[in-house]
Every structure is written in C-alpha cells, then in structure tokens.
From Swiss-Prot:
It holds the Pfam family Lectin_C. InterPro entries: C-type_lectin-like, C-type_lectin-like/link_sf, C-type_lectin/snaclec_domain, CTDL_fold. Belongs to the snaclec family. Coiled coil: none annotated. This is Snaclec 8. Residues 34-148 form the C-type lectin domain. GO terms for molecular function: toxin activity. Heterodimer; disulfide-linked. Shows greater sequence similarity to the beta than alpha subunits compared to other heterodimer snaclecs. Contains disulfide bonds. It comes from Echis carinatus sochureki.
Amino acid sequence: MGRFIFVSFSLLVVFFSLSGTEAGVCCPLGWSGYDQNCYKAFEELMNWADAEKFCTQQHKGSHLVSLHNIAEADFVVKKIVSVLKDGVIWMGLNDVWNECNWGWTDGAQLDYKAWNVESNCFIFKTADKPLVTYGLQWDTQFRLQEPG
C-alpha cells in the first residue's frame, strides 16, 4: 500500500499546453503529448502574468495549461509530480477584470469546472473600475499512488 500525494493547482511550477497538434505528430523535443496537445513543465518562479507571457514565447500557440477533463488533469499531474516542490502550479484559468467570469488563456471553452464549491468572487465597484477579489480553489484532489 503506497501513500497518496495531493496536488492542487495554484502557484509554483509553470506548465504549458501547445494545442492544435494532429494525431501522430511528434511534440517538440522535451514536450509530452496527450490528446492532440503538447505539455511541458518549467521550474521557473514568476507571477501569473509573467508565466503566461513566458509560455507564449516558448512555441507558437502555447499558453498556460487548460484542463478539460479528469483524464487530462491526471496526465498533467503525473508529468509534473517529480518537479513539484510545494505541490502547486500556475494554470491558464483567469478572470482578469471579467467580474468573476472565468476563462482559459488559450481561448478554450471552460467545460471542466473542478473548483471548490466554497470558492467565491466578490466585486466591489469603484469610481474608475470594478475591484475584483476572489478565493478560487481548484478542488480536484489528484491521488497518485507511490510504489512501496
């Protein structure tokens, strides 16, 4: 019986998705393929905006990772578990001045919502613009059984 590792998405390891690859097409060297997308983890410390910018500079069409089902999320976690230090990564889900309407940086449809039901978003209007504060917690607890 092995122990379980719990991973939630938030802050440390930068991970990217390169969409639009066709079946049978190889990903760039150092990238891993899954369901017509290519993925790569980078151990770079940066804020979310810089992480997205860094990602778009890696390869044409690349963005921070977007997740569309539990199988894809499991694939991502298995690829990054060896480099995780604090168990958290940046992902492409954002709400930049969009008043709690979340979206992926790659423009993909938000079809897989795995955040905590207790997540909340508060909008305070100021004279100039809305001030948005939120506590969004991605709630998918990935359980990877370690050998031993």
